[in-house]
Amino acid sequence: MKVRSSVKKMCDNCKVIRRHGRVLVICSNVKHKQRQG
């Protein structure tokens, strides 16, 4: 899980979602997991 000020899709499988007021990126590639911090 990377914590970044700007989260971006890193590939076509990445999805940007909002959970509990946080912006997250979920993906089949574990290295692409991000959240805004």
Swiss-Prot record:
The keyword Ribonucleoprotein applies. InterPro entries: Ribosomal_bL36, Ribosomal_bL36_sp. GO terms for molecular function: structural constituent of ribosome. SUPFAM superfamilies: Ribosomal protein L36. One of its GO terms (cellular component) is ribosome. GO terms for biological process: translation. Keywords: Ribonucleoprotein, Ribosomal protein. HAMAP family: Ribosomal_bL36. Belongs to the bacterial ribosomal protein bL36 family. This is Large ribosomal subunit protein bL36. It comes from Deinococcus deserti (strain DSM 17065 / CIP 109153 / LMG 22923 / VCD115).
